[in-house]
């Protein structure tokens, strides 16, 4: 069987700043990547339909003016939403990280069984402490329908945001939970729920929610940055872990496998 190498459209422009590391993550997972400015899509120089995965990276699109991810989402709504809807209906994948999650939230891409694409069901509000949070956290994969997170339990990832507090109303929360659309929740290093406790839950997210997906499991967004934490050397405790491993005659693996697995799962989706 010939292995399919999916092509990833890594969105760029107007303050997005995580294109390179995001493209690198997909390349390490076995995909081909193109970093494409949104204006090239609007001008027709590149087409969403030519790709299998659309990636909305992190950053500060439009400087978070009018709210994080809002202006970039409006540019897509006004120019590319028909193309995006066609892409979704074709059964392909979309991933958004941090600002990308905020863009996708504003676009209304996390459809419930009771809603259509384009209907916004949640928000990502200012952190409870009204501070920009830049730290490492633990997140736990729930029993979800998300295709990106199979085989992952607890993983260690960095966050970097000022508006990452997930919020939805109680009715929406219960529908997300019942349909297994709550993908990642903040937790401690053992996988125990954060229960809103800072800094385990770094932003005050409702029900500790760090990431959700749409009703199909093919569209996924999260606030933490797995693409920034592929390598073990990036962890803040790396030198300590390295010394302990050395004394025990062990070697630290090159990759934080759970974080790389998110991108591998996307590639493997097209090889089932």
Swiss-Prot record:
Q: Name one GO biological process term.
A: 'de novo' IMP biosynthetic process
Glutamine amidotransferase type-1 domain boundaries: 8-272
Protein origin, superkingdom:
Archaea
* Keyword annotations from UniProtKB, A to Z: ATP-binding, Cytoplasm, Glutamine amidotransferase, Hydrolase, Ligase, Nucleotide-binding, Purine biosynthesis
The name on file for this protein is Phosphoribosylformylglycinamidine synthase subunit PurQ
InterPro entries, per the entry: Class_I_gatase-like, PRibForGlyAmidine_synth_PurQ
So, what pathway does this thing act in?
A: Purine metabolism; IMP biosynthesis via de novo pathway; 5-amino-1-(5-phospho-D-ribosyl)imidazole from N(2)-formyl-N(1)-(5-phospho-D-ribosyl)glycinamide: step 1/2
> What organism does the record attribute this protein to?
Methanococcus maripaludis (strain DSM 14266 / JCM 13030 / NBRC 101832 / S2 / LL)
Name a Pfam family for this protein. GATase_5
Which gene carries the instructions for this protein? purQ
């Amino acid at each position: 069987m010939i292995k399919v190498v999916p092509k990833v459209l890594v969105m760029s422009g107007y303050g997005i700043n995580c294109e390179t590391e995001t493209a690198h993550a997909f390349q390490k997972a076995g995909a081909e990547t193109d970093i494409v400015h949104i204006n090239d899509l609007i001008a027709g120089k590149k087409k969403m339909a030519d790709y299998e995965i659309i990636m909305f990276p992190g950053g500060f699109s439009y400087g978070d003016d009018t709210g994080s991810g809002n202006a970039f989402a409006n540019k897509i709504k006004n120019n590319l939403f028909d193309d995006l809807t066609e892409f979704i209906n074709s059964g392909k994948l979309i991933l958004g990280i941090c600002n990308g999650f905020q863009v996708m939230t504003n676009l209304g891409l996390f459809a419930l069984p009771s809603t259509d694409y384009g209907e916004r069901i949640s928000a990502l509000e200012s952190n409870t402490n009204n501070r920009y949070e830049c730290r490492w956290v633990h997140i736990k994969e729930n029993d979800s329908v998300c295709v990106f997170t199979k085989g992952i339990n607890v993983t260690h990832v960095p966050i970097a945001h000022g508006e990452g507090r997930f919020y939805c109303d109680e009715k929406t929360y219960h529908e997300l939970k019942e349909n297994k659309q709550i993908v990642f929740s903040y937790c401690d290093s053992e996988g125990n729920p954060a229960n809103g406790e800072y800094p385990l839950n770094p932003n005050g997210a409702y029900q500790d929610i760090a990431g959700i997906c749409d009703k199909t499991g093919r569209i996924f967004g999260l606030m933490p940055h797995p693409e920034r934490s592929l390598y073990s050397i990036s962890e803040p405790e790396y030198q300590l872990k390295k010394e302990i491993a050395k004394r025990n005659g062990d070697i630290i693996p090159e990759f934080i496998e759970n974080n790389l697995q998110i991108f591998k799962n996307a590639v493997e989706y097209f090889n089932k």
